[in-house]
Amino acid sequence: MESALPSIFTLVIIAEFIIGNLSNGFIVLINCIDWVSKRELSSVDKLLIILAISRIGLIWEILVSWFLALHSLAIFVSGTGLRIMIFSWIVSNHFNLWLATILSIFYLLKIASFSSPAFLYLKRRVNKVILMILLGTLVFLFLNLIQINMLIKDWLDRYERNTTWNFSMSDFETFSVSVRFTMTMFSLTPFTVAFISFLLLVFSLQKHLQKMQLNYKGHRDPRTKVHTNALKIVISFLLFYASFFLSILISWISELYQNTVIYMLCETIGAFYPSSHSFLLILGNAKLRQAFLLVAAKVWAKR
């Protein structure tokens, strides 16, 4: 049974790869069509396009890394190839996490209602705020790349001094764990920011519901529905990201202790986030949901 597990996990990874490319490709396609037809696009739709593209890149990185790890081929990659592979992973993962976090901030500034002058100032300049945050995250990306490059250089120097198979395999595993740990630490910041956005949205919704109960008893309020939909999107991101974060954390621990089964399981769970969360974004967006249902109806009618 254990010998069949790599094949089973590989099939799951491939399924996640297909779902992820279809869902993220759908987001890009529909928004680009809308952009061409209307000659304009909202800020949230632009964020979704960039987020979907970054996730497509991340999904491809996950697939390539999976097969390299499965067949122990990563150690044979050249220094330049190793840098390209790891840097591509870092860049796609960086924008994947930060753009989803920025989306949470966007919903907070657009939907939440606070009387704080600072919040009102940011709310009036939401597009500039989003752009400044996006540019500011490049500092984290730059620092992450510098740290990883130092780890790569250190490992390559040791590898050139001692090229025996046993040393190379054990040292590469230690190097891989160090890379994962560094990436995990840099991933904590966007998760924390998204979590704070979620708490502020909850607080804003609670205040709004209390106000509605006092002043508008018996009436349905569309703003409450907007709050709820935004919370669903942010909660789904937090839950998927938490599973992604924990899977990475457990996978580098299992890799350190050479537990192959746990490592493969965690890698499979981690790939679920960029593949499936985009599908929830489609269902949570009125335009994308309508287009998806239309396509699904046409496909079903042809059967």
Curated annotation (Swiss-Prot):
Pfam families: TAS2R (PF05296). This is Taste receptor type 2 member 13. It is found in: Membrane. Residues 29-55, 107-128, 206-232, 283-303 are cytoplasmic. InterPro entries: TAS2R. Keywords: G-protein coupled receptor, Glycoprotein, Membrane, Receptor, Sensory transduction, Taste, Transducer, Transmembrane, Transmembrane helix. The keyword Glycoprotein applies. Glycans are attached at residues 162, 166. Coiled coil: none annotated.
